[in-house]
Amino acid sequence: MDLVKQAEWNKELPKTWDELFDLAQKINSLNGKSGVYFGETDTWLILALSLERGGKLINEKGKVDFNNKAWQETFKLLSDFHTLAKMPAIKRSEAISSFYAGNLGILIQTSAALTQTEKSINFPLKLSKFPGVQSGGELPVGGSVVMLTNDKNKEAALKYIHFVTGEANAYVPQYTGYMTSNLLANAKLKDFYNKNPNYTIAPSQIELMGNWPSFPGDNALKATNTLWNYAEKLLMGTSTNYEEIAKQAQEEINALLP
């Protein structure tokens, strides 16, 4: 929050992307400081930009369609990080180090990094909800699938699964920042949440949580990497033509899908 105060942002943290870019620009004006970094090298944050607008990853034909309002706005927003917010063209690891050092004002990344971040900084940290979620929009969240056979050798694994998904799940937010997936465990975290308000941000958005969609077929990972590679062109400023980038990404990804 030190850079936010230095930038004379004397109001609530941004609730929209326009407000976030405005704050980023103010921080950019401080000597040697950067405003914002879109901090993941996976596609879930990119998906969040579309899903919060009601977008879908795969259409009814099993293909991607980036030529619609939600996805066009998403690709433009990715470009805006470079053109408007002047996001530094650096690696994620460098951005995290910059944030730890107090030289980066806003870092957009997974809540799983919260505990480590708190241990690594010497300034007040405040989390904010994901900006710009529109009516009917969702945010993608992760999940796990457990599959066991009747093999007796799996007994120990099953006991462990019962443990980590039960009341012990209360340790998950305390040691990572992730939201617990167990409502009973969550109820027991009241005192922890009162003392650590940053950890309430993730569960406070539970009504917005939706599926984390993936690409179909054997080339799902290649398609995922392709989407990120095109998004990175906009984030890093290699290209500012978001419409052409969206078109190229759609063509290349659909060629990979069944």
Task: Outline where the language-model segments fall.
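Periplasmic solute-binding protein
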Residues: 1-12, 21, 38-60, 139-147, ...
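Extracytoplasmic/periplasmic substrate-recognition and gating elements
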Residues: 7, 80-84, 118-181, 212, ...
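Short helix-initiation/N-cap motifs at beta->coil->alpha
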Residues: 15-22, 88-101
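Hydrophobic residues within well-ordered alpha-helices
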Residues: 20, 27, 50, 98-106
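Glycine-centered hinge/linker elements that transmit conformational signals in sensory
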Residues: 21-26, 61-89
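Alpha-to-beta junction loops
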Residues: 30-34, 101-109, 123
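Beta->alpha turn/N-cap motifs
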Residues: 42, 92, 109-114, 203
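Long, aromatic- and glycine/proline-rich binding clefts that accommodate carbohydrate-like moieties
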Residues: 175-229, 233
